Regions:
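Fe(II)/2-oxoglutarate oxygenase catalytic core
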Residues: 1-156, 162-189
């Protein structure tokens, strides 16, 4: 597969305002509420586990190739087309939809890659904020200098998986976000 290196001196953290309209975000939130959410797990060496000291938000996972393709069409001209011997081929169809209520957060962590097979995997997290009527819930990147992203409805955020970050505690209101990944395939097969 593709060998990766992260240069923390110049991390890739990129905002794309207005990726989704307010109406589109409201439809996503309605879909999340209709499906219902469960306590989110974290991946450990022994498998997926609920670890509420690290992560206490809720989520629902939706496998939706059509929505992933629509998101890809919207972002493909704005994101890196190549990384470490791989070319951009799409957006992961596994859409993780997050719900954070007051007191909920996701402590500092790095995101894992989605590995489809030995030739294709994700390299960047692709987040879309579905609302902004809440206090707290910033995405904080622990780089030098620290970067704090205040969510705005419909805004996309892209960053390299290994960058340590957190979703800070919600003080009031409910935060909704959609997370997926940018997928890359190795040139040399």
């Amino acid at each position: 597969m593709i060998a990766a290196e992260l240069d923390l001196a110049k991390p890739f953290i990129f905002e794309l305002p207005g990726l989704l309209s307010t109406d589109e975000c409201e439809r996503w939130i309605a879909r999340i509420k209709k499906l219902g959410t469960d306590l989110a797990t974290i991946n450990t060496r022994t498998g997926a586990q609920v670890e509420s000291l690290i992560r206490n938000n809720r989520r629902v996972i939706i496998d939706d190739s059509d929505s992933a393709f629509d998101l890809f069409k919207r972002v493909k001209d704005h994101v890196p087309h190549e990384i470490h011997g791989g070319k951009l081929v799409g957006v992961n169809e596994r859409l993780r939809c997050y719900e954070y209520e007051p007191g909920q957060r996701f402590a500092p962590h790095s995101d894992g890659a989605f590995v489809r097979n030995e030739h294709e995997q994700s390299w960047y997290t692709f987040m879309v904020y579905l609302n902004d009527a809440f206090e707290g819930g910033e995405t904080v990147f622990f780089v030098e200098p620290e970067i704090v992203i205040k969510p705005k409805i419909g805004m996309a955020l892209f960053f390299q998986h290994p960058i340590i970050h957190e979703s800070s505690e919600i003080k009031s209101g409910v935060k909704y976000a959609l997370r997926t990944d940018l997928m890359y395939r190795a040139y040399q097969l």
